[in-house]
Amino acid sequence: MARAFTLTADGGSRGNPGPAGYGAVVSEDGKIVAELYDYIGVATNNVAEYQGLIAGLTHIHSLDPEATVEVQMDSKLVVEQMSGRWQIKHSNMRELAAQARAAHTPSLVKYSWIPRDLNSHADRLANKALDNESGGSESHVPVQINYLTDRLRSDEVPTTIYLIRHGETPMTPERRFSGSSHN
């Protein structure tokens, strides 16, 4: 059975056009699967919004090409254009919309507009991308946060789990394992 994801995405530009970045949050069953953000150089806020959408859909497609996706964005323009209710007049926006459609099967994606205050997580990531801007380099790799360690406070130590498999023991043929109820 195909998985179901929620994608919230946001983009921002300081100057419009100006330095721009995006943030995207991928969730499954209410749990965050991935946080993505990237600085994209000088662009408009609409270009940054589309880039966040494309990054999120691309990531979801890499997890499960047949997954259904609920996209939630505070950009009325992107939501309405991707839903087919508004025309896409500018050629650069048409190209970005085509990239978004190519990133994941359009029939598996549903778009919803949400108020800005419900998109604060993706907005924070977009601002993080802008704050961490790396001097205008043209080659950027989107950052995926390791959700288990990158969100720790400075005084916390990440838990390390080791799975050790020892192979067969004298009890293996009898199916007697540590913690089992057999005597």
Can you say where each PLM-predicted feature lies in the sequence?
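N-terminal start-of-chain detector that recognizes signal peptides
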Residues: 41-43, 82-85, 155-158
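Short amphipathic alpha-helical leader/targeting segments
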Residues: 66, 136-138, 179-181
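Terminal low-complexity/intrinsically disordered segments and their adjoining alpha-helical capping regions
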Residues: 88-89, 93-176
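Flexible, active-site-adjacent loop/turn segments at secondary-structure boundaries
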Residues: 38, 84-86, 112, 175, ...
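Residue-level signal for beta-strand positions within conserved beta-sheet cores that form or flank
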Residues: 20, 34, 67, 107, ...
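RNase H catalytic domain
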Residues: 12-16, 53-126
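RNase H-like nuclease fold core
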Residues: 1-47, 51, 58-63, 161-167, ...
